Amino acid sequence: MTTDIIKTILLVIVIIAAAAVGLIKGDFFSADQKTSQTKEYDETMAFPSDRYPETAKHIKDAINEGHSEVCTIDRDGAEERREQSLKDVPSKKGYDRDEWPMAMCKEGGEGASVEYISPADNRGAGSWVGHRLTDYPDGTKVLFTIQ
Amino acid sequence: MIKSWKPQELSISYHQFTVFQKDSTPPVMDWTDEAIEKGYAAADGAISFEAQRNTKAFILFRLNSSETVNSYEKKVTVPFHVTENGIHIESIMSKRLSFDLPKGDYQLTCWTVPAEMSDLHADTYIIDAVSV
């Protein structure tokens, strides 16, 4: 009888400890659950922060602020969205204006996050993204994560 | 062979557009500070030219043209090899332009003509391919 009680207590302790560890690490709210919560997407893109740190930080900050982490490709609307997102952000010598969500994404446009980024970082990042997405047709939903 | 293609519209993003081999994918370009200073980056048989502004622009492609460009902001010349007949030009996630440039070695010169200097009233990039 006493052994059963001890076993039960130990089991409860193990369950509570596991739950606490899960909460601390954020496992309960990341990965699978987040994926199913957020959205539908067709492809994933792990953006390399070691290669393009400034652009990666901007993407991460913008997503944390509530901007979409999914980009629905829509090439035709890019020009108009870029005009909307940059209208109140003047160009600055020696910097590029990086938008998140990008202008090519349906989620971009007015209200997009815009950050001044060094040209080497931003243009390399653009080339990297273009290389990976160029064959995807309009309408493809791409989930971005920061690696 | 002398040829001039009609101007084609291209939506510029990330201050660049890439000339690359037909039926291939534009490679990842390493835009170092030196590449930005020179106005172009190169990798895997492709060349990316710097574009001044992210906006709709015209690409005017010419082969062995003797016409001069009188007003321009910047001029960049680089060697380029066409491995099979044909090349593409695109910016980041733009539409893809195609030109039936014959296989061979060329000097590519990209003239940047801002909208205020262009007869087309939009940023214009004249690309002269000269056979070598």
Swiss-Prot record, chain A:
Chief localisation class: membrane
Membrane protein topology class: Single-pass membrane protein
Notes on how activity is controlled: The activity can be inhibited by the 18 kDa competence-specific protein nin.
Any Gene Ontology biological process: establishment of competence for transformation
Keywords (A to Z) from UniProt: Cell membrane, Competence, Hydrolase, Manganese, Membrane, Nuclease, Transmembrane, Transmembrane helix
Record text on cofactor binding: Mn(2+) ion stimulates activity.
Gene Ontology CC terms, in alphabetical order: plasma membrane
Protein name: DNA-entry nuclease
Gene coding for it: nucA
From Swiss-Prot, chain B:
Keyword Membrane found: yes
UniProt topology in membrane: Peripheral membrane protein
Main localisation: membrane
Cell compartment(s), UniProt: Cell membrane
Keywords in alphabetical order: Cell membrane, Competence, Membrane
Any one GO biological process: establishment of competence for transformation
Domain of life per record: Bacteria
Cellular component annotations (GO), alphabetically ordered: plasma membrane
The protein's assembly and partners: This protein is a subunit of a 75 kDa protein complex, which governs binding and entry of donor DNA. The complex is a tetramer of two subunits of the DNA-entry nuclease and two subunits of a competence-specific protein. Only the complex is able to bind ds- and ss-DNA.
Its biological purpose: Plays a role in the competence of cells to be transformed. It inhibits the activity of the DNA-entry nuclease.
Name by which UniProt lists this protein: DNA-entry nuclease inhibitor
Record organism: Bacillus subtilis (strain 168)
